[in-house]
């Protein structure tokens, strides 16, 4: 890692120039001069003889100096590099939804709901469970990845309110993940919507899971769900579903919604988008602008 030199006044500018002009190749990045440099001593070169000695940025303003100093620094890799994410930003949105898919991957229901939310002014990051959970994960590992995604996209898209949405496999995992988020990240989450919630969660996609065969690694959802604030939760299920936890949750003060159809809710995407938007609005802080 080679340093960047800054000449802050006439004398500093002359010294920075001299250092670059006499530097060994690739030992400094260059010099930025925040004003005219003083004259060099007799016999001293002020210009580098080779590009490998570095560059000299003349008469640089404060921002140009700052940019020149930062440019050569190694950029940190996002903590979630390589995760199977789908970005759907909504221009000007202050709201961010993280949508964790079912174990079939990023399919028509996930795509449709996410696109509908973006049309309503909510930025969405989709999370492909099939690709992510094809290797065995732990709740702690997945929660750490989720925290990194939330923190990065809040910063990148200037979002201050977060909604967590899970469908099927993703819904089963979501209570485990929320409970393991760092407190500061958890505080940014306004609502959690669980679509097609089951009784047990798995942290690895398997063929047996597609066939409905339980795994010895499955963990019960109810103990984790009991730790969540009930007011922020929405549980949606299809009237034809036979094995869903949602109906039993209404007695706990959790909002429960029944739709037509089975586990895919008759593919009524507009109705699902409206339910999710309404849950977000109910849990938004007082005075927050509504999504369009």
Predicted regions span which residues?
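Short, surface-exposed "cap/lid" segments of acyl-processing enzymes
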Residues: 80-82, 86-130
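Active-site loop/turn elements of alpha/beta-hydrolase fold enzymes
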Residues: 8, 122, 127-132, 197, ...
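Alpha/beta-hydrolase active-site loop
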Residues: 109, 136-164, 172-176
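The feature captures the conserved acid-bearing segment of alpha/beta-hydrolase catalytic domains
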Residues: 3-51, 89, 199-261
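Second-shell loop/turn segments in exported
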Residues: 102-104, 131-140, 152, 163, ...
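Short glycine-enriched nucleophile-adjacent loop
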Residues: 1, 171-184
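Residue in the alpha/beta-hydrolase core beta-strand immediately N-terminal to the catalytic nucleophile
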Residues: 161-163, 167, 190-193
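C-terminal catalytic histidine-bearing segment of alpha/beta-hydrolase fold enzymes
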Residues: 43-88, 137-140, 253-292
């Amino acid at each position: 890692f080679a340093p960047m030199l800054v000449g802050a006044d006439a004398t500093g500018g002359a010294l920075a120039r001299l250092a670059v002009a006499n530097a060994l190749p690739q030992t400094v990045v260059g010099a930025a001069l925040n004003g005219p440099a003083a004259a060099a001593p007799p016999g001293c070169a002020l210009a580098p003889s080779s590009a490998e000695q570095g560059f000299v940025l003349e008469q640089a303003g404060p921002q140009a100096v700052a940019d020149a100093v930062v440019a050569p620094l190694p950029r940190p890799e996002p903590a979630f590099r390589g995760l199977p994410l789908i970005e759907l930003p909504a221009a000007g949105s202050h709201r961010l939804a993280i949508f964790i898919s079912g174990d079939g991957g990023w399919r028509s229901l996930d795509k449709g709901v996410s696109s509908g939310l973006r049309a309503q002014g909510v930025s969405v990051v989709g999370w492909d469970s099939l690709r992510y959970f094809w290797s065995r994960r732990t709740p702690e590992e997945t929660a750490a990845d989720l925290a990194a995604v939330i923190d990065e996209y809040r910063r990148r898209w200037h979002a201050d309110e977060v909604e967590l949405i899970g469908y099927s496999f993703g819904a089963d995992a979501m209570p485990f993940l929320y409970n393991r988020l760092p407190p500061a990240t958890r505080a940014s989450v306004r609502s959690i919507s669980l679509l097609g919630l089951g009784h047990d969660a798995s942290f690895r996609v398997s063929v047996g899971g597609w066939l409905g065969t339980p795994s010895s690694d499955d963990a019960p959802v109810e103990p984790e769900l009991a730790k969540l604030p009930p007011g922020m939760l929405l549980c949606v299920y299809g009237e034809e579903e036979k094995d869903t936890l949602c109906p039993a949750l209404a007695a706990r003060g959790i909002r429960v919604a029944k739709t037509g159809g089975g586990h895919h809710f008759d593919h009524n995407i507009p109705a699902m988008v409206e339910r999710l938007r309404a849950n977000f609005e109910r849990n938004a802080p007082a005075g927050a602008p509504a999504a369009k």
